[in-house]
Amino acid sequence: LYTWFMNKIASHIEKNGGKAIIRSCDGSDKEKPLDKNIIWQVCDKDMNGKVVSREGKMGRAFINSSSPHYYLNLPYSMINLKKTYEYAPEPVYGELLGTEAVIWTEHISSIKSLDFMVFPRIAAIAETAWSDKDDRSYERFLNSLPEYYDLLNIYEVRYATLKQANPSKLRKAAYGVAWRNKTVNFHRLYDLAEDEKSRSLAKKENR
């Protein structure tokens, strides 16, 4: 059903001059493949994974937003600056259209927090997304950060310092606990709000 539905939608979009982009190819297989003209924005998989390889061999085009390396809403305790910079997916079959960093903001409460999560990881992604492995140097990147930070200071961006972006074991543990608590509390509040909506609707229907 998933494959049939997505192919119908993609066909409709293409007839109207657009191009369908999906976040998952899990419902696609050799017997019932998704239309190869659908672009896969790889979010929940690694670009080095088997599913990506299979779909690429079928001629699919990709956008690389693979988790966790390009998920900027994840704490530095899970994916630090060094890991972000050194992520180097193998060349894929098919066509790689580009790279897009992702940040889900439901757990981010302020612009200050947003700045902290995005910078300087976005600079690492910008430098490495189209660079060959041989052209990359993490040490050179670190040496260029002071000048980058000077630019961010002009625009009052509240970035993570190098110590914060590559946290020690103790700081990593603290970040992890804070992030998990924030995530759990958000979902609790969301569930409470949904429960209240359901009760309100039930009252209206019973009137």
How should these model regions be labeled?
Residues C25-E31, H69-L72, F141-L145, A165-K169:
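A glycine-rich phosphate-binding loop feature that marks nucleotide/adenosyl-phosphate handling sites
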